[in-house]
């Protein structure tokens, strides 16, 4: 068997590995601010704002101009396409603002979930057409890493083998295209929390999905040291009758990861999956407190679980800007502590304890 072509050069590999390690340096995680125009519209509507370019720009500016010390807890921020090319009130491009503060810039590159023919309502993710050209342009424009989300559902008949294999291969094709263009790929095979499944079922499905994903990454010659994984935590379904303790979620999650994710992967950045802000932090903390060998950084890539309280504090009013930024800093610090197993819950505000679950969530 001959080696694959074109192979990454040693310099390309070093750049990718360095980027991945910087993003998940000790105590740091990712702020996912890559909500689509439609999803941002839903967020803005909740606080009585119209979904306009300027409202979206102002909100992202609020996030990105939070005190520079946030870099102690945030290693990377994922942008949406329009955000890559927006500027502050003072004319500073958001990309420059973030990078000048030592935070790496990511970009969402998938084009959303579409139906997968031959399955019972399952999907695959589109966006491979033209991906190489887009990645090359994003790299020129300052991006360091990319994100691509695939979605799988748990039901009596899903995920099907077809869905698991198809989504694994799509993620692998995306990952190798990113690496050829100097971007670290975040590989995100999200198993939705919708349903009434128990913890064992979620763990079993998570293991099968991750095993297939890493088989595909190997088949496509992806350089694992220059990747990050963004998985779901292993939890019961949102409609499940029984609740679970954080220690149970932590053990099921870590067991699934230890069985499937190679130690070459530098970091695992969990998605919050509709958990409340506080639950997402408590579960991350519990995972990191487990006394088992953990060969990767275990940290966060949260969107809703970093921003829900921020949006409420802001309420669309400029006079609330500082209060909203203080809330972002607080949640970032909490999750930074949780990524080291050092978070001590002190009770939560009403917003932090609210479930952020959205059925069949789409970005």
Swiss-Prot record:
Pathway connected to this protein: Carbohydrate degradation; glycolysis; D-glyceraldehyde 3-phosphate and glycerone phosphate from D-glucose: step 4/4
Tissue spec. comment: Expressed mainly in the skeletal muscle, heart muscle, brain, and some other tissues, but probably not in liver.
Residues at the active site: 230
Catalytic activity: beta-D-fructose 1,6-bisphosphate = D-glyceraldehyde 3-phosphate + dihydroxyacetone phosphate
Molecular functions (GO terms): fructose-bisphosphate aldolase activity
Subunit: Homotetramer.
Protein name (database record): Fructose-bisphosphate aldolase, muscle type
Taxonomic source organism: Lethenteron camtschaticum
Taxonomic classification: Eukaryota, Metazoa, Chordata, Craniata, Vertebrata
